Amino acid sequence: MESFHGTTILSVRRGEQVAMGGDGQVTLGHIVVKASARKVRRLYREQVLAGFAGATADAFTLFERFESKLEKHQGHLVRAAVELTRDWRTDRVLRRLEAMLAVADRSASLIITGNGDVLEPEYGIVAIGSGGAYAQAAARAMLQHTEQSPADIVKRSLEIAGDLCIYTNQSHTIETLE
């Protein structure tokens, strides 16, 4: 059986501002089954942004686990991410999940990989999913050569990724923290 997959999630940080956005397309094999999915959410008292790429059911499992770790560690993003990956590596069920998370708060942006790794990317840009490389390239250029806000950079970068990646559409959800 084929799994649900394909998306673009992008987070851009500039100074005290961070924005995260994602497209809304969900595919099953080569068929679009939903065009307006919400893959970026606010967690822990609206203070953390999180987006997912990968198998939808697996991503929701990770969201729930990550949110419980945030509660346990009073919103401390890095500690919650490390705790989640520790569980991920030791739990047989979690190890089989096929999803990635992009998470950000006012001070840090992280990628939590399907291998149970926590990565802090360079340039204040997090990009995951099938269109992630396109969105990341666009965002990096705009971040370096314009004064646009993170939300504007995310919006335009997702549009570019949607033009190039068949698993990414033009229906976007964008959240910001200031």
Swiss-Prot record:
It comes from the Bacteria. CDD domains: protease_HslV. The keyword Oxidoreductase does not apply. Its EC number is 3.4.25.2. GO terms for biological process: proteolysis involved in protein catabolic process. InterPro entries: ATP-dep_Prtase_HsIV_su, Ntn_hydrolases_N, Proteasome_sua/b, Proteasome_suB-type. The active site is at 7. Keywords: Allosteric enzyme, Cytoplasm, Hydrolase, Metal-binding, Protease, Sodium, Threonine protease. One of its GO terms (cellular component) is HslUV protease complex. Allosterically activated by HslU binding. Its main location: cytoplasm. GO terms for molecular function: metal ion binding; threonine-type endopeptidase activity. It catalyses: ATP-dependent cleavage of peptide bonds with broad specificity. The keyword Hydrolase applies. Pfam families: Proteasome (PF00227). It is an enzyme of class 3 (hydrolase). It is found in: Cytoplasm. Na(+) binds at residues 162, 165, 168. Protease subunit of a proteasome-like degradation complex believed to be a general protein degrading machinery. Belongs to the peptidase T1B family. HslV subfamily. A double ring-shaped homohexamer of HslV is capped on each side by a ring-shaped HslU homohexamer. The assembly of the HslU/HslV complex is dependent on binding of ATP. This is ATP-dependent protease subunit HslV.
